């Protein structure tokens, strides 16, 4: 006897499987609608990627992805996070080494735009903070370390600026970015490597004092002030002091 979970898995597999002559007509229509909606979801979440590789190519990869990794959540705004990694493993990535990073930037922007509206942390809150605490990352925050040319390509493709796109030279140096929407407007900000490491450490939930050791005492106050001004955090939570797993030498 099938459990409810088994029945749900079987129904999901039937919806996403390739149609055959044995497929009931009603299910075939529903299946095509489901797959079409999931493919459309990916197109909306990855606009620059879509324009970069073209409608037909994107559609082919999106359909493969839908079959390989169907959604696990009813909220389709959450569907597609694994798509950049899927593209990175594709043959197309060998021809377009920046492709996956363009897709990651698409996803980070999509995430920021659909995150819950949340005010950023007021720096004055720190005056009354407990002795040891960690920051709560802003819901819209996404941290990315991309190829530098990927960011330029992403912008040029969305602006449909062919001249600008043609002038972009290959550049695989790293651009550490934060993507967020703390005050209603989308922001894409490049950080120094040290600032990015600090942001990543704090966003991961490490207490403030050991996290500041990553960047050094001289720059710590200024760096923290900048991160707060950017709106990276939405709150703080008390936390016991703990050591970083890989303390700086």
Language-model regions, residue ranges each:
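Long, charge-rich, low-complexity alpha-helical segments
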Residues: 1-128, 184, 189-249
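Low-complexity, glycine/alanine/valine/leucine- and proline-rich hydrophobic stretches
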Residues: 140-204
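Short connector loops at helix/strand junctions that flank enzyme active sites
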Residues: 78, 136-138, 173
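A general structural signal for short secondary-structure junctions and capping/turn motifs
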Residues: 101-102, 132-136, 168-170, 225
